Amino acid sequence: MMNETRTTIDQDEIDRFSRIAAEWWNPKGKFRPLHQLNPTRLAYIREKICLAFNRDPVSLMPFENLKILDIGCGGGLLCEPMARLGAMVVGVDAAQTNIEVAKLHATQSDLSIDYRTTIAEALADKGEKFDIILNMEVVEHVADVNLFIAATAKMLKSQGVMFVSTLNRTWKAWGLAIVGAEYILRWLPKGTHDYKKFLKPQELKNLLSKNALTVIDEIGITYNPVNDSWNRSKDMDVNYLLLAKRP
């Protein structure tokens, strides 16, 4: 049964994203940074999944027969490209409004994606297993990160991989992701991020290791203001992504 006293839900976070749900598919709207970031993270995800599962990276549908979970899927910005690459995709989000937007857009795009309004621990209790879990820009928004990582790790099949991206707890991240992005450039609504919820890479690695997952790759993702683009980097001071595998 789902734990009655502990939950990953942060209702304030859910309410905040619910208020701007209609913006998900507007590339110039409140989720503009995610639209800009998407090509970089998609290229990395595709490359690493093909390596992990010995798939042809130039194939039109290299993810065929792979089951992917996108946890905290929002409006489906990652679910849709995963489905186009042939995967069986389950997208979950705690905000009903996000799921409604995602379902509508998938229908308009003629894509079959299993969208559900639920939370990590409730889904884990059902015993479903996935080849790949996308845990992208979510851990900094949950109420109990230990419970969240435990629940998501529980759903990963043997030899499966999980991508986890978040923000580092550094003054540089505070200055760029909060002061810069929310208050100066106003890319994101004020209050989108809580610095106390940022995790240092080693802290996240420890949580993954505690749940029998081994980190096999790590990258930083940095913003280049000159050409207004996001790129892979060795600099993990702000945005970073870990790739973990279950033996």
Swiss-Prot record:
Binding site for S-adenosyl-L-methionine: R41, G72, D93, M136
Top EC group: transferase
Keywords tagged on the record: Methyltransferase, S-adenosyl-L-methionine, Transferase, Ubiquinone biosynthesis
Catalytic activity: a 3-demethylubiquinol + S-adenosyl-L-methionine = a ubiquinol + S-adenosyl-L-homocysteine + H(+); a 3-(all-trans-polyprenyl)benzene-1,2-diol + S-adenosyl-L-methionine = a 2-methoxy-6-(all-trans-polyprenyl)phenol + S-adenosyl-L-homocysteine + H(+)
Transmembrane segments: none
Pathway: Cofactor biosynthesis; ubiquinone biosynthesis
GO molecular function annotation: 2-polyprenyl-6-hydroxyphenol methylase activity; 3-demethylubiquinol 3-O-methyltransferase activity; polyprenyldihydroxybenzoate methyltransferase activity
Top-level taxon: Bacteria
Cross-referenced InterPro entries: SAM-dependent_MTases_sf, UbiG_MeTrfase
One GO term of the biological process aspect: methylation
EC number: 2.1.1.222, 2.1.1.64
Ribonucleoprotein as UniProt keyword: no
Family: Belongs to the methyltransferase superfamily. UbiG/COQ3 family.
Function description: O-methyltransferase that catalyzes the 2 O-methylation steps in the ubiquinone biosynthetic pathway.
Protein name, per record: Ubiquinone biosynthesis O-methyltransferase
Lineage: Bacteria, Pseudomonadati, Pseudomonadota, Alphaproteobacteria, Hyphomicrobiales
